[in-house]
């Protein structure tokens, strides 16, 4: 018994070992697409786990743990390679701008329900300067909803602008006519936009965060419902909203593959949308604008948060 305790003390509680073993366990489980809510959380933090592994490497060097530091570097390399290669639908960027024919500029902004309506004037100025064709708002209070209505002169078309909205509902504003609008009970908005003689289906959605078992299961049901919508929608499709998934997540990569939707992710020009109070390079992107394969991304950026815990995501597409 004493020998076993001594072995545990040497291997587990030796300086740096707890952090080292925790890092290995997190790396392993975060790359599995398990239907377990507390493990799923780690899958969305791939970039942060990698940064933690690099910091751990220097800690192990400081503690003179040579072999542990070597293993740590090796795991970091394998982990980074898996992150970079896991999403085959995250590379839809237009490299040759001479191919641009038609453009569509979109903004998705989770305003945050508790955001003061006093911040709307700055939000309005941002929208005017970015000149989008389509704007989607999410998580807005009744007071902020009243402010959004003042944009009617700029965006004359909308998805039921005058109807009351819940905290997880979406509201789409457009400069171009919207037809066949449908708002359902799954926090999903579906509408059609015709631009340059091309009909485009736009789906706005707010997926629940998987922080609890109940919310995680509800989010999986929403994803299953979205797959059905995408399957029954025309080939020109844009899906946007707070998806509560990051590009490093296996669940996100699987969703893109099964719906045949695309996006563009750059780890050089990071666009973290949440949480806005953290530096961009430490945050995560949970707000997305996804599209079918006949679109390509021209530009993607974020701006100031204007009192929200999310940053607005701005994307320009070519089609």
What are these regions (language model features)?
Residues 2-3, 44, 64-68:
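Positively charged n-region of N-terminal signal peptides that target proteins for export
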Residues 13-60:
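Membrane-embedded alpha-helical segments of integral membrane proteins
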Residues 133:
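Short acidic/polar active-site loop segments enriched in Thr and Asp
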